[in-house]
Amino acid sequence: MGSLRTRQLFHAALLWLCLPLPLLLCENLHCYYSPVLEKEITFELVVTECPPNEMCFKGLGRYGNYTALSARGCMLEKDCSQVHSLRLLGTVYTMSYSCCDWPYCNRAVALEPLTAMLVAAAVVACSFCLT
């Protein structure tokens, strides 16, 4: 019984050490890309690799109080959190950008890296409990 418990703890510790390795070894950040589109238009997100010194962003275009446009991709950190005007099909939208600096962080549903790691660890730990 003790040996099985020790082995399970060892596997859990190993998992906690191995999960962050890919994040630490990657040179450039991987993000999702989509062009500036009307919010209602669905677009299959494309994975892109950002150039050095760029971060993932998610941009929203507003017309008055209505969020009408969205975009994703890479941008320089100095350009993050900025707001500017964009003219599209004769309408002027106010584009605002929010940036993040971990892989695939600009997807539609926000999921923090620590949360993802904890969920993965819980799944693995439960699989050991069932065996």
UniProtKB/Swiss-Prot annotation:
Bridged cysteine pairs (disulfide): 31-56, 50-74, 80-99, 100-105
Domain UPAR/Ly6: 31-106
UniProt-annotated location(s): Cell membrane
Keyword entries, A-Z: Cell membrane, Disulfide bond, Fertilization, Glycoprotein, GPI-anchor, Lipoprotein, Membrane, Signal
Pfam family, one: UPAR_LY6
N-terminal signal peptide: 1-26
Transmembrane annotation, as ranges: none
Residues that carry a glycan: 65
Lipidation (GPI-anchor amidated asparagine): 106
A cellular component term, taken from the record's GO annotations: side of membrane
InterPro entries linked to this entry: LY6_UPA_recep-like, Snake_toxin-like_sf, SPACA4/Bouncer
Quaternary state and interactors: Interacts with spermatocyte complex composed of izumo1, spaca6 and tmem81.
Family per record: Belongs to the SPACA4/bouncer family.
Free-text function comment from the UniProt entry: Oocyte-expressed fertilization factor that mediates sperm-egg binding and is essential for sperm entry into the egg. Necessary and sufficient to mediate species-specific gamete recognition and fertilization, which is essential for vertebrate species performing external fertilization. External fertilization cannot guarantee that only conspecific sperm reaches the egg by precopulatory mate choice: proteins such as Bouncer can therefore support the selection of conspecific sperm.
Note: Zebrafish oocytes expressing O.latipes protein Bouncer can be fertilized by O.latipes, but not zebrafish, sperm.
Name this protein carries in UniProt: Protein Bouncer
